[in-house]
Amino acid sequence: MFKTRLLSGIVLVIIAFATIFLGGDVLFVTLLIISLIGVSELYKVVKIEKAPLGIVGYIGVVAYYFLIRAQKKEDLMMFAIILLILVMAVYVFAFPKYVSEQVMTAYFGVFYVAIMLSYIYQTRLLKDGLFLVGLVFLCSWGCDTCAYCVGVLIGKHKMAPKLSPKKSIEGGIGGLAGAALLGALYALAINKWGGASAGVGEYALICFVGGIISMIGDLAASAIKRNHEIKDYGKLIPGHGGILDRFDSVIFTAPVIYYLAVALM
């Protein structure tokens, strides 16, 4: 199991960084596909992945991505309103086929998965975006890895025993310290070998804050699974589960990195 998880994790990291490096349409299409799969995993939890209500959500994901591709940010509020009206229209005209939880999930899923993940693409468009996008994955997966290692070594006090019994406060602190250190080392590396002019302190701060948010994202995904008594969202990634199992922290971190980069850079 560990070997499978390690190998698939290495492949995932290689694919992620190759896609980020290429950027443009490759990154756009990849994120669109990942978002659609992630939304379908969430919809499967409430059994609407193949229902008309779910199809409205998928259409919403595609429409949203093409809005940001065309840089039509001024139309996003109108998009949110139209999507809400369409979801509620399916609800009332099919009543009582769907319960309110399914309806709210159909709408929520577009925001939780697609809109949050789209900030990876939007961050890539920023000045030094190639380097900044790396922070999304560095602070998410880096914090998780450091937290796991520290937790195994010295973890004693449970962070959220009802959600994730294996996570410890000591591991969380180690994860944040590790994320900040990785951010600083990353800045030094891209300055030396990538021709960047990244601020070491700024990158460390971004990764520290991103690490906090990544833990919230991880626990939020766990809470949904606990509520519905499921172990994983899917089986797409061997040893890891589904898209939401692997990208749960990235979903929360991506928009935070974007806005911190805009504010600090």
Question: What name fits each language-model region?
Answer:
Residues F2-V209:
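Membrane-embedded alpha-helical bundles of polytopic integral membrane proteins
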Residues R226-S249:
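Interfacial loop-to-transmembrane junctions
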Residues A179-A180, R246, T253-A254, V262:
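Hydrophobic transmembrane alpha-helices of multi-pass small-molecule transporters
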Residues V152-L153, A223-E229, I251, P255-V256:
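Re-entrant/interfacial helical elements at transmembrane boundaries that shape
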Residues F208-I216, I243-I251:
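Hydrophobic transmembrane alpha-helical segments of multi-pass transport and channel proteins
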Residues W141-V152, S214-R226:
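Short helical (or helix-break) motifs at transmembrane helix termini and adjacent helical loops
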Residues Y259-M265:
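Juxtamembrane boundary at the C-terminal end of a transmembrane helix
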